[in-house]
Every structure is written in C-alpha cells, then in structure tokens.
C-alpha cells in the first residue's frame, strides 16, 4: 500500500482506495417544499392525484395517492399505475393494464389542476420561516431547495412563500435535471448554484423516502421529517 498524499492511500492490487472524510462545518441546507416548509401533510398533490384518477374512471385511495410522494409528478403517476391494486381495478374497468400513454395523458391533465390549487395549500408550516432565518442569519448557511414539482409549479410557490417571509437562495425543480428523486441531480445542481463544496458540507431535509434517498445518493447529510410526513 502506497501513501499518495497525506489523505489518500492506494493499493495497486485493489480497484478501491481509501480517501479522506470531510469533518468541517455545514455550509448549506437544502429543503424540500410541500410537507417540509409548507403544506403540512402534503395535501396539494394528493388531492389532485385523486381527481386525475377519478376522471379516468379508476378512483384511488389517499394512501395510494401518497405512497410515491417525493418523486417527479409524472413518475409519481407512473408508480401509482404500477401498484397491483390499481392495475387490478384498471383492468376491471378497461380490460387492459395501464400503459405509458395513460401516464402521459394523466400527467397532462395533472399539471393545470396542480397549478390551479397550489395557492390553496401554500401556508408555511409553523416554525419553518423562523428556522430558516436562524440558519441563514445566525449560522450563515446558504438555503437551497428541491421538489417533485416542475418549474411552473415552483414559480407559484415562490410567490406565495415569499409573501410569508420564505425565500431560498436557490431553486431547483424536478424538470431541470435528467432524473429527479431519488437520484442526486437536484442536490448537485443546488450545490453548484449555491457555490457550496464539498457535498458533505450540505444537509438535505425532506419528509419523503425518495427525498431522503436523494440526499444520501448525492453524498451529503440527509434528514427526514416525521410529523409532516406524506
């Protein structure tokens, strides 16, 4: 085993090497939107998923609507159609299982409905604004954001949140990256836009399983919220 630098050890017979670990200060926090800073309980997308599937003639339960929460909304719809219970009801209704054409159609129908109701579910969660202000003003951290919402949806939330005193330094929407949660790309995009490195100096906060995985996939700290969990 050879000492390459003061922080890296390399074994020529191995495909792997030992690397240093960051032990410095936290420099940035990336927060999810619905269920983390506003819309306690994440009702906004859930009620729209219910409406979209009801319109298709295949009603779903609130539990089914919530299960994939955190994903890009088109992916969310696709995951609902892959649930055995939903597939069974779809087959009973149409004599076939749901396909990608159905997913695309439902997503097209979902978008205007979601944008239309976002303001009805845009109340900041108690303590969120105060917490972010403390992180920014007292700990001098940069504030980023990720979401399963698309850019037009985030634009609606920006205005509603800013009127309540919340404005992240960075916004990244699900349609700005090759693949959204649980993939790491939105976190990495935040790191670039916040100009924060290393990635280990960032904490990702979310109320969904995919949102927590997004942080761990990116290589940063990841914190899950329970009381507002979807």
Regions found by a protein language model. Give the residues of each.
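Asp-based, Mg2+/Mn2+-dependent phosphohydrolase catalytic module
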Residues: 1-28, 129, 133-139, 150-230
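N-terminal helical cap/lid subdomain that shapes the substrate entry/recognition surface
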Residues: 8-15, 19-129, 133, 137, ...
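Short catalytic-loop micro-motif centered on adjacent basic/acidic residues
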Residues: 63, 144-145
């Amino acid at each position: 085993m050879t000492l390459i630098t003061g922080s890296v050890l390399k074994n020529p017979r191995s495909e792997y090497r030992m690397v240093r670990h960051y032990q410095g200060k936290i420099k940035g926090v990336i927060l999810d939107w619905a269920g983390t800073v506003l819309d306690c309980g994440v009702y906004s997308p859930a009620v729209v998923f219910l409406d979209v599937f009801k319109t298709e003639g295949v009603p779903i339960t609130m539990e089914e609507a919530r299960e994939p929460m955190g994903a890009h909304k088109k992916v969310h719809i696709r995951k609902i159609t892959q649930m055995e219970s939903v597939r069974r009801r779809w087959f009973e209704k149409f004599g076939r299982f749901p396909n990608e054409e159905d997913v695309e159609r439902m997503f097209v129908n979902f978008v205007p409905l979601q944008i239309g109701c976002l303001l009805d579910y845009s109340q900041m969660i108690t303590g969120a604004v105060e917490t972010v202000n403390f992180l920014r003003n007292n700990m001098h951290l940069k504030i980023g954001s990720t979401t399963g919402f698309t850019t037009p949806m985030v634009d609606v939330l920006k205005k509603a949140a800013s009127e309540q005193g919340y404005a992240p330094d960075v916004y990244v929407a699900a349609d700005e990256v090759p693949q959204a949660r649980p993939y790491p790309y939105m976190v990495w995009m935040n790191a670039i836009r916040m100009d924060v490195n290393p990635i280990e100096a960032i904490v990702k906060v979310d109320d969904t399983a995919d949102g927590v995985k997004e942080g761990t996939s990116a290589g940063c700290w990841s914190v899950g919220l329970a009381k507002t969990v979807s």
